[in-house]
Amino acid sequence: MAISKIGSNSVNLASGLDISDGNVTVASGHGIDFSATSDLAGKSSELLDDYEEGTYTVTLTAATSGTITMNGSYNTGTYIKIGRIVIASCDARISSTSSPQGNVNIGLPFAVASDGGSYLSSMVTHGVTIQTSQQGDFFIKGNDGQSYANVHYNTTTNLGLQAQNGGLGANDEFQFN
């Protein structure tokens, strides 16, 4: 391995770097720079500057009125954040409801990026289709800047309908990732 000094604050390591024990710590605002492999015009960054794993409390809300109380044993979601990408999953169950009305919203660990787009994820439900008569493939859609996602469903004749809270009840279950 060749080590050389570059300028007053940099070191160049030739032939790689092996660390037998410990971590590599990067100062805030810095990361791993992949610009040496610049491939596509229009890219905005080649710096991997964030990684995080954690849990968050999952919430379901009624967009218009009423409340949805989550089962405390089934309201913890997990997430992995790599750069700007967040992969979240949960197994959330309802404990009780009090006259929920309007669209179903499910809380996310981070707000959706405000970049002019929306993002989709598949969802599995249990009990929801029986009580609400909203049958079909459920999915969640997060929009610009929202800290929650809207629950939608598809039928054989309609795509992207927003799920309504009216029929939700105890033990209804939402799972996504």
Report the location of each language-model feature.
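A broad, low-specificity signal marking well-ordered, structured residues that form hydrophobic/aromatic
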Residues: 32, 54, 106, 149, ...
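Terminal beta-strand-rich extracellular "head" domains
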Residues: 71, 92-153
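Domain-scale recognition of soluble eukaryotic interaction modules
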Residues: 144-177
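Surface-exposed ligand/attachment interfaces on beta-rich extracellular proteins
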Residues: 37-46, 55-82, 91-114, 159-171
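Intrinsic low-complexity, repeat-rich intrinsically disordered segments enriched
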Residues: 1-67, 89, 94-98, 129
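A general structural signal for short secondary-structure junctions and capping/turn motifs
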Residues: 23, 78, 139-142, 167-168
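Substrate-binding and catalytic surfaces of secreted/luminal carbohydrate-active proteins
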Residues: 86
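Generic beta-strand structural signal
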Residues: 19, 81, 142-144
